[in-house]
Amino acid sequence: SSQDVQRPVCIIGLGLIGGSLLRDLVASKHAVYGYNHSTSGARSAIKAGYDVTDDMPAILARAEADDALIVIATPMNAVDSVLNQIEEHAPSCGITDVVSVKTEVRELFLKRGMES
């Protein structure tokens, strides 16, 4: 729907894939913001003009308030922790991922009853 096209995007993990997605969405003038675990990485992104933080609870609370689509772009070993944070701070947001493996991510979603 047109509402989904306008929906802000919150990217969790700003490495190669998440960072590329953030830059492309900014370039297309889409509302996007992100989280990076590394404080220095977050600072670098902020200096480059991107809307980024290293405070996951705050960015997820913002995503919840904005009804944002959350994109998980972290290494597989961080997904469980990220999902725990999403359950706590952004339980009504839509979620997708760009993690390189799918079966394990799906199992983590199913374990929480988060499938759609």
What do these predicted ranges mean?
Residues V82-S116:
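Rossmann-like NAD(P)(H) cofactor-binding subdomain of soluble oxidoreductases
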Residues N36, A73-T74, V99-S100:
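Conserved residues at beta->alpha junctions
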Residues S40-G41, A78, K102-V105:
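Conserved short alpha-helix immediately C-terminal to the canonical SAM/SAH-binding motif I
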Residues S44, E64, E104-L108:
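Short, charged, surface-exposed secondary-structure boundary motifs
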Residues S38, M56-A58, V101:
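Short, solvent-exposed coil/turn elements at secondary-structure transition points
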Residues S28, A48, D66, E88-H89, ...:
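Alpha-helix C-cap/termination motif
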Residues M56-T96:
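Rossmann-like NAD(P)-binding element
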Residues S1-D54:
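NAD(P)+-binding Rossmann beta1-loop-alpha1 motif at the extreme N-terminus of oxidoreductases
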